[in-house]
Amino acid sequence: MTSNAQRRDITRDRIMKAAAALLRDHGPAAVTTRRVAHQAGLQPPALYRFFQGKDDLLDAAAEHVFAEHVASKQTTAPSDDPVEDLRAGWNTQISFGLANPYVYGLLLDPARARHTPAQAKGVLILAERVHRIAAAGRLRVSEERAVNLIRSAGIGTVHTLLTLPPEQSDPHLADAAFDAVARAILADQPAVPTQDPAAVIAAFRILLPELPSLSKAEAALLDEWLRR
């Protein structure tokens, strides 16, 4: 027998799928309580048991679409080349933004800024990929700086490509943007002290938790010094 909680979850899932489909295909203006309720096979008042209004529904719909995207990224097994994995993740993210302009616009709208679970998970996946590069001695900046540079460049690239007039579209812009970021954050080869001290520092910070001779406090202090 289905419990009340299960029925509620099933109904909410129907609403979310209906709202997400309208958002993806027709944009925020199409996500009205009446249209969503019709698509979900419900009466409009039923939606207010789950959402306070249209803005709440829009945010939830955008989060639903992005959560599906992030979940698909988690199923991708890492390769032996962390830099190529980073490039593949970049391409996937750019493709998602271009294929879902309405969703991307809502997620990045400063007036609606929200730190959602899916966004946090997406940043974590990126941070893990950057961490693998640092562990390989290929990172010339801090992991935090690398993550922020990649995110900034990715958001800017998607926004630019979405707003360019068709006659000015540049199919190679995303690749060029990644290459520019890569030059800024990557060492050409695993670093040695005489080649790239910044990359050595980034790699050494990865090893700090594994140094048995240091206490947690000592490791934290050394990490603070290395960040400077």
Region spans (language model):
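Generic hydrophobic, amphipathic alpha-helix propensity
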Residues: 11-19, 36, 61-65, 69, ...
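Helix-turn-helix
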Residues: 14, 22, 26-56, 60
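Short amphipathic alpha-helical elements of helix-turn-helix/winged-helix folds
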Residues: 18-22, 96
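Short, hydrophobic secondary-structure boundary micro-motifs
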Residues: 32, 105-108, 142, 193
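Hydrophobic alpha-helical connector segments
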Residues: 60, 71-103, 110-114, 121-123, ...
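Amphipathic alpha-helical packing segments from all-alpha helical-bundle domains
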Residues: 111-162, 170-183
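C-terminal peripheral helix-coil segments that are non-catalytic and often amphipathic
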Residues: 128-131, 166-228
